[in-house]
A protein has these predicted regions:
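Conserved, well-ordered core segments of regulatory domains
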Residues: 1-6, 11, 60, 80-91, ...
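Generic structural signal for hydrophobic core residues of well-folded globular domains
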Residues: 20, 91, 95, 178, ...
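Short, charged, low-complexity patches
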Residues: 37-41, 96, 100, 188
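Conserved beta-strand -> loop -> alpha-helix junction used to position metal-binding or nucleic-acid-contacting
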Residues: 58-65, 70-106
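Acidic/histidine-rich catalytic cores and adjacent linkers
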Residues: 76, 109-226
Length: 226
């Protein structure tokens, strides 16, 4: 988001959205920083903990380096899922244009399986097919394999919502769209106020809505918490 400090700069806005076992979702916290780094994410996680968020069952994130370690320090019992959409984008950026469509279509099959065992088979077939052409890509994918299929450990009714960060991406798009007419924010306080208003509007909008699938498995999800 554009912000004027001493010069015109683009600020990183860190946003955490959560879904309760009953399916109610809300913006839990946010902060503004000059750039994205793990230290700020660590502070945000600690802020959420200090404000009363005692337990997290599943944490979904893009590929920020160190995020899993930071999460383990604040919420050691939380499980970590890497956003498969971000992983796919990263893969497509590293392969030849003529291979992108095939690779993208095959990678999408990973999150469309009936169970984790089938997804593992699809993933390993993906390795075997593309390893010769893109050894570095497959090697990197194998390094993060433990974080790719965690969402299969949860009820099938909610898996479509927990394999990617699309929920946050949608909120980010709202912020970008509404911020665009402003060109830039004159102060950090004005930007903070703007983000706060968008967060409250989001929370008001979804206060009594149950996210798709969660109502069907509420009892199961509640059993994961102390």
């Amino acid at each position: 988001v554009p912000l004027r400090r001493e010069t015109f700069e683009r600020e990183a806005v860190y946003i955490a959205i959560g879904i309760k076992p009953n399916g109610h979702k809300e913006v839990i916290d946010y902060c503004i920083a000059p750039n994205e780094n793990i230290e700020v994410w660590t502070e945000l996680l600690q802020s959420m903990k200090s404000r009363g968020l005692e337990q997290v069952e599943l944490f979904l994130s893009d590929g920020v380096v160190g995020m899993k370690t930071a999460l383990a320090k604040t919420y050691p019992q939380a499980h970590f899922q890497r956003c498969l959409v971000h992983v796919m984008r990263n893969i497509c950026a590293k392969v030849r244009v003529e291979d992108r469509e095939a690779i993208m279509n095959e990678f999408k099959q990973i999150h469309q399986q009936a169970n984790k065992a089938a997804a593992v088979d699809v993933l390993h077939d993906f390795y075997a097919k593309w390893n010769k052409s893109y050894n570095h890509v497959i090697r990197n994918l194998k390094d993060i394999e433990p974080d790719l299929l965690v969402f299969y450990n949860y009820p099938k009714q909610i898996r479509a919502s927990i394999y990617s960060t699309n929920m946050i991406e949608s909120f980010n798009n709202v912020i970008k769209r509404k911020a665009k007419p402003k060109a830039e924010f004159p102060t950090e306080q004005s930007l903070d106020t703007f983000i706060g208003i968008q967060a409250m509007s989001y929370n008001d909008r979804y206060f009594n809505r149950i996210h798709k699938g969660f109502g069907q498995v509420q009892d199961t999800l509640e059993s994961y918490f102390d």
